[in-house]
Amino acid sequence: MTMQHRCVSDLMTRDVVRTGRDTPFKEIAKLLMEYDITALPVVDDADRPVGVVSEADLLRKEAQQPDPAGLLPAAHTPHADRAKAEAITAEGLMTSPAVVSHPEWSVVEAAREMESHHVKRLPVVDDSGRLVGVISRADLLRVFLRRDSAIREEIQGDVLTRTLGLAPYSVTVHVVDGRVTLKGTVEQANLIPVVERLCRGVDGVVDVRSDLEQKSSA
């Protein structure tokens, strides 16, 4: 039996609110408020994401409008922001191209993609590029809400016994708030970093403290 880790398809929202290129500003704002979301993917006629339009995109448009009272000085506006200020549909308002993920991605892969592109959510697409879900930062954080007992059972059963073949109870596992403490002995010293690495890869693990030692040959 191999260790099974939750991937994007296990955590994503499948019933996705989306919009088309021609959706007007007010309709986008209405959708965001109606569904209590902060962004939604913009798709083409084949349901492939071409961009994402967010509250920030809508507010950026409003921020570039002239002050009706004439009290605020006109600010220097970059060309991209001027274009958004003049846009009236999703195609002009959206941030594109869409940064996407795939259902089989690990939590780590999705998190790194969000971090590298400074986004809070990713449309999820299948092999043909069609939208099948959305994964958010909040979805990824759910991994760390696993019960300590579930984490301990996976480490003891999958990591130590089935994967590494260690004798039962040769290593004791304590888990508190996702922090793992390992105590016991292993046959070979070079197994210690392997045990630590595999434990860190278990869903929900926040940190690993190892007090493992090589078993005495005496």
Which functions belong to the PLM regions below?
Residues 1-38, 45-48, 52-218:
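N-terminal targeting leaders
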